[in-house]
Amino acid sequence: MKRIYVVGTADTKGEELAFLADAIAATGAAVSRVDVGTRDATIPVDISANDIAGHHPGGRDAVLGGNDRGAAVAAMGVAFARFAQSRNDIAAMIGIGGGGGTSIVTSGMRALPLGLPKIMVSTLASGDTAPYVDVSDIIMMPSVTDMAGLNRLSRVVLHNAAQAIAGMAARPAPPPDGKPSIGLTMFGVTTPCVTTIADALRSTYDCMVFHATGTGGRSMEKLADSGLLSGVIDITTTEVCDLLLGGVLPATEDRFGAIARTGLPYVGSVGALDMVNFWAPSTVPERYRGRLFYEHNPNVTLMRTSADECRAIGEWIGTRLALCDGPVHFLIPEKGVSALDIEGGTFFDREADAVLFEAIERTIKPNANRRVTRLPLHINDPEFAKAVAAFLDIARH
């Protein structure tokens, strides 16, 4: 039977954990109380901290055997993530916590599939939640007061959280329409291209467009790793620029890793590889003073990538795509890679583009499965929607 997992540190938040579990059970839902504390529980639980700790690669003692609380919290987070991945009876998960508890519980939530309901009631929910949510779909709910015993406000907050998670578990989202899903990456400067492609494919595919802001690429690749995508049209690979050159919207070192691991059909291009993103002009690192910039808006400053930087970017992309055994088709628009990189545009630079294109062609190691095609077009030309035909071709393959 699928159950709602109610998770918290039963050594310090036992009263709140019991109240939340009882409120959910009162709706008729099956509940499992899960303890992720690092000391003795103060309430009965269904799954003990000792059980969770046993999932740590270093064994239970790696979590519970020391006296360093910070190390124990970090180790419990690792163990809980592995525990969550091992279960097949989770209908939904709800957690409560302060700083340590939020870190532990969300580690496990991030390991769960996208779409499975997750609510974290936390004292940290009104602050910077990016480290806890990352690219998952965790709902962060402020506890308002600290969790140091129940009071009239915390009872209301926990009651509302209980009703929310019970409702999500009882009425899951309807199944999709059966069309396979594909991921596409887009930036403002590649919008005409990606919009045209998505419009052409919607009758056959469920098109999920991701804003290439660092988190967008990670979200898309998480879906790929989760088996929720049937292919990727990665027109906008700009996040690599920020990774290599210190921009504010970077990819991670694992960019393209999901494509290599899954072997999904992949069409890629060089969208917005002419730019690195920074915030307001005053935030641009001193080493870049004197470079060519474009003020996208008062809070976003774009820097044109140089020929040497384009070589490094192209080699980084090509080397990683060379690890992909699935069908790969990389398209190069010879007349420009963004709305700014067009003849007469602020970032138009034939030399830098030529170096970029050569580096990708040289390092991607074309073979029967990996192809590179140059097109005498700008990336936003309507004809560049030949990427659609390329995707359909490799998807059939």
From Swiss-Prot:
<protein>
    <recommendedName>
        <fullName>UPF0261 protein mlr3387</fullName>
    </recommendedName>
</protein>
<dbReference type="Pfam" id="PF06792">
    <property type="entry name" value="UPF0261"/>
</dbReference>
<dbReference type="InterPro" id="IPR051353">
    <property type="entry name" value="Tobamovirus_resist_UPF0261"/>
</dbReference>
<dbReference type="InterPro" id="IPR044122">
    <property type="entry name" value="UPF0261_N"/>
</dbReference>
<dbReference type="InterPro" id="IPR008322">
    <property type="entry name" value="UPF0261"/>
</dbReference>
<dbReference type="Pfam" id="PF23189">
    <property type="entry name" value="UPF0261_C"/>
</dbReference>
<comment type="similarity">
    <text>Belongs to the UPF0261 family.</text>
</comment>
<dbReference type="InterPro" id="IPR056778">
    <property type="entry name" value="UPF0261_C"/>
</dbReference>
